C-alpha cells in the first residue's frame, strides 16, 4: 500500500516492501465466488492480531500501474454509452479471479468502457460490430475500503457473454494491476477516463458496482463496493 507521501511525490525514507507473492487461482475451479466475505474482528482469531481494523471513515490511497485491454463484440451497434455500460458491466458475472483485485478490476472495466472505439467495418469479424481499447499507465485511487492486499504483476483474462435487451455478444478483458512503490507523483485513476462520454458519473459507476462520493475538494472517492452488482 502506498503512503500519501508517495502519492504526492514527496521524499521520505524508503521502506523495503514486505509484500508476498500470491499465485493466480485455478480458473477451472467450479466453486462459486458470488458472496461477500467478511474478516473477523475478534483479536483472538488467527491472523487478526496485526490486522488493521476497518474504519469506513478512514481515507486511504493506493498507487499502482495498470493495463486494460478490452474487446467487445455485439450483434448490433451500440447507440449510447448507457448501452455499452449495461453490457460491459457484466464482465465479472460468476467472477473467479483474485478477490483482492476485484474492486480495482471493476474500475479498470469502467475505465476501458469509457474509452472504447469502434473497429472499422472492414476489419470486424464477419462484419459484426466490434469495439476495442487499450489503456495503460500509473494512477492512484483514494478509497475507504480498508487495507488492501498486495498486488503483483500478474495479468488476468476474462471472457463473458452478455444478453441485454436488443444487444448480445461477448466481452474479452485482459487486466493487469500491481503496486507502485515509487516516490513519483501519479494522477488519480479518474483522470484516465473519457468523461466526454457521460455526465452522470456516480450513476454509471454504480452500474459497475462502484459506490463513489465526492470530497469537499471535488475529487471522487471510492466509498465501497455494491454487493448487488
Curated annotation (Swiss-Prot):
Motif (PTAP/PSAP motif) on chain: 37-40
PTM comment text: Phosphorylated by host.
Tagged with keyword Chloroplast: no
Extent of motif dynamin binding: 2-4
Keyword set, alphabetical order: Apoptosis, Eukaryotic host gene expression shutoff by virus, Host cytoplasm, Host gene expression shutoff by virus, Host membrane, Host mRNA suppression by virus, Host nucleus, Host-virus interaction, Inhibition of host mRNA nuclear export by virus, Membrane, Phosphoprotein, Viral budding, Viral budding via the host ESCRT complexes, Viral matrix protein, Viral release from host cell, Virion
Stated consequence of mutating residue 156 to A: Loss of host NDUFAF4 binding. Loss of host GTF2H5 binding. Loss of ability to inhibit host transcription
Positions of the UniProt region annotated as Disordered: 1-23
GO terms for cellular component: host cell cytoplasm; host cell nuclear membrane; membrane; viral envelope
GO MF entries: structural constituent of virion
Usage in biotechnology: VSV is used as an oncolytic agent for cancer therapy, because of his wide host range, rapid replication and mild pathogenicity in humans. VSV used are mutated at M51R in their matrix protein. These mutated viruses cannot successfully infect normal cells, being unable to counteract the antiviral state induced by interferon-alpha in normal cells. Cancer cells are impeded with responsiveness to interferon, and then can be successfully infected and lysed by the virus.
Pfam families xrefs: Vesiculo_matrix
Subcellular location: Virion; Host endomembrane system; Host nucleus membrane; Host nucleus
Effect listed in the UniProt record for changing residue 160 to A: Loss of host GTF2H5 binding. Loss of ability to inhibit host transcription
One BP annotation, GO: symbiont-mediated suppression of host transcription initiation from RNA polymerase II promoter
Organism domain of life: Viruses
Biased composition (Low complexity): 1-10
Membrane topology classification: Peripheral membrane protein
Domain-level remarks: Late-budding domains (L domains) are short sequence motifs essential for viral particle budding. They recruit proteins of the host ESCRT machinery (Endosomal Sorting Complex Required for Transport) or ESCRT-associated proteins. M contains two overlapping L domains: a PPXY motif which interacts with the WW domain 3 of NEDD4 and a PTAP/PSAP motif, which interacts with the UEV domain of TSG101.
Family: Belongs to the vesiculoviruses matrix protein family.
Oligomer and partners: Homomultimer. Interacts with viral nucleocapsid; this interaction contributes to the virion assembly. Interacts with the viral envelope glycoprotein; this interaction contributes to the virion assembly. Interacts with host RAE1-NUP98 complex. Interacts with host NEDD4 and TSG101. Interacts with host dynamin. Interacts with host NDUFAF4; the interaction inhibits viral propagation and is independent of interferon activation. Interacts with host GTF2H5; the interaction may inhibit host transcription.
Primary role: Forms a double layer around the helical nucleocapsid, the inner matrix layer binding to the N helix and the outer matrix layer binding to the envelope glycoprotein. Plays a major role in assembly and budding of virion, by recruiting cellular partners of the ESCRT complexes that play a key role in releasing the budding particle from the host membrane. Condensates the ribonucleocapsid core during virus assembly.
Name assigned to this protein: Matrix protein
Source organism of this protein record: Vesicular stomatitis Indiana virus (strain San Juan)
Gene responsible for this protein: M
